[in-house]
Amino acid sequence: MLSENVKKISMVEKVGYASGDFACNLIYATVSTYLLFFYTDVFGLSAAAAGTMFLVVRIIDALADPFIGTIVDRTNSRFGRFRPYLLFGAFPFVILAILCFTTPDFSDMGKLIYAYITYVGLSLTYTTINVPYGALTSAMTRNNQEVVSITSVRMLFANLGGLVVAFFVPLLAAYLSDTSGNESLGWQLTMGILGMIGGCLLIFCFKSTKERVTLQKSEEKIKFTDIFEQFRVNRPLVVLSIFFIIIFGVNSISNSVGIYYVTYNLEREDLVKWYGLIGSLPALVILPFIPRLHQFLGKKKLLNYALLLNIIGLLALLFVPPSNVYLILVCRLIAAAGSLTAGGYMWALIPETIEYGEYRTGKRMGGLIYAIIGFFFKFGMALGGVVPGLVLDKFGYVANQAQTPAALMGILITTTIIPVFLLVLALIDINFYNLDEKKYKNMVRELENRDKVYLDHIDDFKA
C-alpha cells in the first residue's frame, strides 16, 4: 500500500496550488516587466537611478530570504507550516503592489524615497508569500513524478498569468489612461484590478491544498546557521542555486528590455503586447508535456536542449533586420520555447534538493532551502533591473525620444549578447547536477523508512 506521502495528487489540488502562482504572476510579473518602464517614462526617474534602485532593493530582498525561510521552517500552526502565509500575506501584498504604481506629488528626491520604500515593502511581502508557497510542493508529496506534474501545472498557470500580463496589461493600462486622461492613474487602476484578482486566488490556493509529508522531531532545532551545512553537503542545491541566478537573470533582462527593443529598435510600439504574448505563448503547448519529456530525456538532456534552443533564438535576432517583424517574432518564439521549458522544469528540482538535504542532515528544511534558492534567483532578477538600466544609460538612452545608433546598439546587445553569454554559463553549470532517478528513488525509500520509524515511536519522541 502506498504511503500518503507518495500517492497521486488530485487535479483539483494541483490547480488550486497552481492558482497561487497565477496570482503572484499577475502582480509580480507586472512589476518585473513594466515597473522599470513606469519609473523612467511615467513616474519620472532617470534610467540610472531606477536601475540602481532595482539592484539595491533586490539585494535587501535577497538577504532577507534565509531569515524568512528559517521563520517558515519554525512555523507550526493549525493551518500547517506553509499555508498560513498565503492567507495572511495576500492583503498587504495587494496594497503594496498598488502603491508601487502610484505617483505621489513629491519632489524628485521625495519620489525616489517613496519608490524605494514601496518597492522594498512589496518585495519583502512577496518573499514572505513565495518562500512558503514554493516549499509547499515538498510538503504535498514525495513522489518525484507527481512533483514534476504539480510543477508543470503550476508553471502552466504561471505562464497564463504571464500571458495576461504581457498581452492585456498594456491594453488595460492604455485604456484606463485614455479614459481617465492620466497615465499615472491608468497604471494605478490597472494594478488595483490585478491585485484584487490575485489576492482572491491566493486565498483559494490556501483553501485547496494539503500538507502531507511527516515532519520529524529534529526539525524543531532548525536554525539560520543550517544554511552553511546545506551548502557543504548538498551539491544539487549549490548547482541549482547557480542555475536559478542565471535563468532568472536572462528572463528578467529579456522582460525588462523587451519593451525598449520593440518601441525603439523596431519602432513598433503597437507590437509590445504581441512581443510579450509570444514570449509566454509556447508555455501552453510545452508545459503539459514536461512530465513526458522528463521521463523520456531525463533532467540534464531536457535542460541542455532547452538552453540551446533559447540561445539559437536569441542569436538569430542579431542577423534579422528590424524591418522584418515577422521573422523577429519567429526568433522570439524559438527563444521563448527554450526559455519556458528550462524555466518551468527547474522548479521541479527544488523538492529533490530538499529531500537530499534531509537525507544528508536528518532535517527537513523546505522553507530554508527554498529561501536559499530565492536568495540566488533574486540576484538574477536584480540583473533584469540593473543591467538594462545601466547599459542603456552607458549607451546614451534618453526616454521618450528617437534614439541614437549607439543607444539602439545598447538595446540590441542587452536583448541578445548578454543573455546568450549567461545561457552558456547555465549549460556548463547544470551538467554538474548529480542526482539522477536511481539515486533519488533509493533516497526517498530511505526517508520513508525513517518516517515509519518515527511514526511507530511518536509517543517516545513526545515523552
Swiss-Prot record:
GO cellular component: a single term: plasma membrane
Membrane topology: Multi-pass membrane protein
Alphabetized InterPro entries for the sequence: MFS_2, MFS_dom, MFS_trans_sf, Na/Gal_symport, Na/Gal_symport_CS
GO molecular function annotations of the record: symporter activity
Main location: membrane
One GO BP: transmembrane transport
Cellular compartments annotated: Cell membrane
PANTHER family, sorted: MAJOR FACILITATOR SUPERFAMILY (MFS) PROFILE DOMAIN-CONTAINING PROTEIN, MAJOR FACILITATOR SUPERFAMILY DOMAIN-CONTAINING PROTEIN
Protein name: Uncharacterized symporter YnaJ
Organism (species): Bacillus subtilis (strain 168)
Name of the coding gene: ynaJ
